[in-house]
Each structure stands twice: as C-alpha cells, then as structure tokens.
C-alpha cells in the first residue's frame, strides 16, 4: 500500500473542499441559529450576573437595616431599663417620704396623747391634793372652810408647789 503524492494532494484538496463546503452550508443554514443560541446564553449569563449583584446589594442593604434595627432595639432597651431605674428611685423616694410623714404623724399623735395624759394626771393630782389639803386644813383648824377660803388656800398651796 503505497500512497503517491498525487493521491495525497488529491485527498487534501477533496477534504479541504468538503470542509469549506461544510462551513458554507453551516454558515448559510445553521450559523444564525448557533449565533442566536450563543447570544441568548450570553444574555442569560449577563442577567444572572446582574441579578447576583443586585441580590448582593440587597443583602448588604438588609444587613445595614438589620444593624440599625438592632442598635435601635438596644437603645430602646437601654432607655426602658433607665426609665425603670428612675421610676424605682422615684417610688423609693415617695415611699420613704410617706413613711417619714406617717412616722412624724404618729409621733405627733403620741406626743399629743402624752400631753393630754400628763394634763389629766396633773389635774387629777391637783384635785386629789386640794381635797387632801382641805381635809387636812379642816382637821388642823377644826372647822369647815367656806368655798372662798378653801379656793384661796388651794391656790396658795399650788403656787407654793409650782415654785418648788
């Protein structure tokens, strides 16, 4: 099997011609469809890239909004805690003031009661003393005193007691 140069050149020309005819047929009938498919694929890839970029930008925006919401929530929580502390302090101050006021009121009532009891006791002692003084004076003098003399004697005796 020996191949000559003429056969090789003939085969080369035949194959080259077939390829050229095939390329011309492809260009005439299929190249538009192939180019359209490639163009559609290129557009689809470009759209996918644009959508991915838009999704990335949206995600960044949502992240920023989430951070802002988180900071706002933290700030609001801090304000709520601070308001609760202030309310607690105000209630503490109010309760202490009310307790102090109630203690002062009870102290004043107790002092009034003490003064009243003291006055009653002094009055009772004065009455008892005046009765005893009159009785003693009657026994010493041996006679009953009239009301004016009795009153004068009691007043003098009480004045002497007050000075002592």
Curated annotation (Swiss-Prot):
Q: Which residues cross the membrane?
A: 12-32
The cellular location(s) given in this protein's UniProt record come to: Cell membrane
Q: How does it sit in the membrane?
A: Single-pass membrane protein
The record ties this protein, via Pfam families, to: ATP-synt_B
Q: Where would you say this protein principally sits, based on its record?
A: membrane
Its GO CC terms are:
plasma membrane; proton-transporting ATP synthase complex
- CDD domains, per this entry? ATP-synt_Fo_b (cd06503)
Which keywords are on file for this protein? ATP synthesis, Cell membrane, CF(0), Hydrogen ion transport, Ion transport, Membrane, Transmembrane, Transmembrane helix, Transport
**Hey, which family's this protein in?**
Belongs to the ATPase B chain family.
Q: Its quaternary structure?
A: F-type ATPases have 2 components, F(1) - the catalytic core - and F(0) - the membrane proton channel. F(1) has five subunits: alpha(3), beta(3), gamma(1), delta(1), epsilon(1). F(0) has three main subunits: a(1), b(2) and c(10-14). The alpha and beta chains form an alternating ring which encloses part of the gamma chain. F(1) is attached to F(0) by a central stalk formed by the gamma and epsilon chains, while a peripheral stalk is formed by the delta and b chains.
Q: What does this protein do?
A: F(1)F(0) ATP synthase produces ATP from ADP in the presence of a proton or sodium gradient. F-type ATPases consist of two structural domains, F(1) containing the extramembraneous catalytic core and F(0) containing the membrane proton channel, linked together by a central stalk and a peripheral stalk. During catalysis, ATP synthesis in the catalytic domain of F(1) is coupled via a rotary mechanism of the central stalk subunits to proton translocation.
Q: What is this protein called?
A: ATP synthase subunit b
> Source species, please?
Streptococcus equi subsp. zooepidemicus (strain MGCS10565)
UniProt lists the gene as atpF
């Amino acid at each position: 099997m020996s191949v000559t140069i003429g056969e090789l050149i003939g085969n080369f020309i035949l194959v080259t011609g077939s390829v050229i005819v095939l390329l011309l047929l492809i260009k005439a009938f299929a190249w538009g469809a192939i180019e359209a498919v490639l163009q559609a694929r290129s557009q689809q890839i470009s759209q996918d890239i644009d959508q991915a970029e838009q999704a990335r930008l949206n995600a960044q925006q949502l992240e920023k909004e989430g951070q802002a919401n988180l900071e706002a929530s933290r700030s609001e929580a801090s304000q709520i805690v601070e308001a609760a502390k202030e309310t607690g302090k105000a209630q503490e101050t109010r309760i202490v003031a009310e307790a102090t006021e109630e203690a002062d009121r009870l102290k004043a009532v107790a002092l009034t009661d003490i003064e009243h009891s003291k006055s009653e006791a002094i009055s009772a002692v004065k009455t008892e003393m005046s009765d005893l003084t009159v009785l003693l004076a009657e026994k010493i003098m041996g006679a009953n005193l009239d009301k004016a003399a009795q009153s004068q004697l009691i007043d003098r005796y009480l004045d002497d007691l007050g000075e002592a």
